[in-house]
């Protein structure tokens, strides 16, 4: 009788569940995965090399395009590394704004993850639900920076500008009558902080809706329970961070263990899993959304009560205000010099890490005293997570490999860099 051999299957890079450009070479025995070999590099854009030829401030927009669903969290790590080298202090109001927008970014990321992961596993309904809330979060980005995604809002020493007093309004159009527009603009009459405050009150009910759709859903549990189990010891040895590590039961969160900016001034809990399977990681991320909402609410209350500067008063680093730049020649020259020549950073090296929605996102910066980085190294959380795929998928079915890729929350912008 003929012996049946294992065969290879190419999964991606055009597969809808490959989350971008993942090429996975699977070695299969029937339908069971024996080996999974991820091939990366299809989205390599040489970000680290490009940063060596741009001034510190010119490299900032590249950070938005690394993990392009967690834009401001990437900027956060980059700004912290520069501030460490410069030895400058960030005003407290700017710290709170950064924390608030980092958590808004976490919601954006987790909603994107939940919608696409649910869709991969066969629940297309959840995708529509999560994108409904993302729309409001994008409006917050737009109000503060003018861009809905790649904001470049965080700056070394603080943030680009203070929070606006008004929100962008929906305009009348052929598809919506005046009454519909009025309903849409109902919670946009006040300032940005009022809009965010309104969102924080509505959002817990939205999370309840997601949980109604998935948490006790029989099919969802069949697709995620006991799939891709990682023990706490293996999770540490494999270099997992963020929800992947917390899903295995280890309460490690940089916001608590190594607080940066105003994280030591806000209250929140660290959700952890028990089993370390895909279902636990789902529960951890859903609970994280509730905690992020709690942090945002605390930031809104503090920011409403405490006006103040939003960028450092060190004028070698901070640009002049737009009002003064448009009325004084000296400020215009200052602005021009700062954005063309940049500022010089003292010789040395610094590593700054943030609790990114996907894990520990770190920037290692080496300066030789010039206005450009001598070397910039990006520590992407997804890179270590993708390397664990072989171990997690072995012995599971092909369909489970899709659920495991989904649970990792992979974005190739940061992995290929």
UniProtKB/Swiss-Prot annotation:
Enzyme Commission identifier(s): 7.1.1.-
Molecular function GO terms recorded: NAD binding; NADH:ubiquinone reductase (non-electrogenic) activity; quinone binding
Pfam families in the record: Complex1_49kDa (PF00346)
Keywords: Cell inner membrane, Cell membrane, Membrane, NAD, Quinone, Translocase, Transport, Ubiquinone
A cellular component annotation (GO) from this entry: plasma membrane
Record InterPro entries: NADH_Q_OxRdtase_suD, NADH_UbQ_OxRdtase_49kDa_CS, NDH1_su_D/H, NiFe-Hase_large
Main EC class the enzyme belongs to: translocase
Catalytic activity: a quinone + NADH + 5 H(+)(in) = a quinol + NAD(+) + 4 H(+)(out)
Cell compartment(s), UniProt: Cell inner membrane
Topological category with respect to the lipid bilayer: Peripheral membrane protein
Principal cellular location given in the protein's record: membrane
Function comment: NDH-1 shuttles electrons from NADH, via FMN and iron-sulfur (Fe-S) centers, to quinones in the respiratory chain. The immediate electron acceptor for the enzyme in this species is believed to be ubiquinone. Couples the redox reaction to proton translocation (for every two electrons transferred, four hydrogen ions are translocated across the cytoplasmic membrane), and thus conserves the redox energy in a proton gradient.
Assembly and interaction partners: NDH-1 is composed of 14 different subunits. Subunits NuoB, C, D, E, F, and G constitute the peripheral sector of the complex.
Similarity annotation: Belongs to the complex I 49 kDa subunit family.
Name of the protein: NADH-quinone oxidoreductase subunit D
The encoding gene: nuoD
